[in-house]
């Protein structure tokens, strides 16, 4: 556990399962409005990186120190956390994806798919109040950050639960899931932006090498079984083009109250990009204007 951190285990009434919160609190008195908060999806994987990054960046006067809340599961095994997250960070599986040749050969997650909306409701209704019980928080300075399916969930929240956060950091978001279903909500979101109803800042990033991945020579048991299937997966996911295209469309809608940045992290692939994405995301969300 990182310095100045505490662990909160609880059972969600909404999701009817157990969760673990990892909460890192700044080692300084809270300002009168409370500390900013970064809610980090996949806390089992990325909490330590985020806390260390926050500690370093907060040394500079132009970056606000913040509470880091890693949302995870009561396990110390990364493999378990990766399995448990699948239903939390997805919408119900559509036939268009289920029948895709490369995806059909993937082992199905034991808990299925489709609980993303419940997960985000749990975050608002169960996690935020628990955090507020242990530290003074600024309800007007809150960030949602996630990688991969966590990035997809972050985009879903941006489009559908915009008022829940002020900053959204989507790192290598899995826009491809369910034939890019998340983009079905883009048009209505843009309408609200144009009407002046949205106040949000979004950072969308991706690793430069995510669309040119090569089939690994070892440790590919959780990937498509052949090089051909793997290449079909890479082509289907379009990680870099999907991110850049969405970023460009949203950037064209920028106006007072709504800001978007898109970043390509040079030399990084999907598994390498979280540290760079988290560092850039903390800087984006917490840099003093």
Regions found by a protein language model. Give the residues of each.
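Non-catalytic cap/lid and distal C-terminal segments of serine-dependent acyl enzymes
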Residues: 1-289
